[in-house]
Amino acid sequence: MTQLRLSFLLCFLVLGLQYAAGQSLPYQTLLKGLYDSNFPVVKPEQITDLKSYQVLDAREKGEFQVSHLQTAKWVGHETFSLKSVAELDKNKPVLIYCTVGARSEEIGKTLQKAGFKKVFNLYGGILHWVNEGRPVFANGKPTLQVHTYSKPWSIWLTKGEKVY
């Protein structure tokens, strides 16, 4: 019986740590199912300065206009073209993101095929970024609004104002 109690305690501790880290176990499971385990990711807590990356937003224009990472360049997803990144340095790290990381991973793979050497997907996308208390911007100013792609996806945003 003691071993069973210890197991339950350990489970609650692990789940509690996941929530304390700003990310639920279901969200982590979702991301694990969406991501290619061979594609490199960077977690928000690993980023000390966005200026060390060429930051690309792979969401649609309306999502970008609601808010985006401060130094992000909009490249889109449905309308993405390598012409939109022609001026970027293929040897400098690229950080690409979308809402949760699925669309950005797809565009990231296209960048790798085009010769970009260091492409990283932002783990958890803009939702995880904001849930970690990191800022987003609109028209050069901080904002609390975050486009969540759609109402069903908005359940994963725990901080900020949901827009869809």
Residue positions per predicted region:
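Bacterial Sec-dependent N-terminal signal peptides
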Residues: 1-27
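Short alpha-helical patches at coil-to-helix transitions and adjacent helical residues
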Residues: 6, 104-105
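Rhodanese-like catalytic fold shared by cysteine-dependent sulfurtransferases
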Residues: 21-44, 50, 61, 65-92, ...
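Structural scaffold elements adjacent to functional motifs in cytosolic proteins
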Residues: 55-57
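Short, surface-exposed ligand- or partner-binding patches at beta-edge/loop junctions that are enriched
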Residues: 97
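Conserved G/P- and acidic residue-centered "switch" motifs that form tight phosphate/ATP-binding loops
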Residues: 101
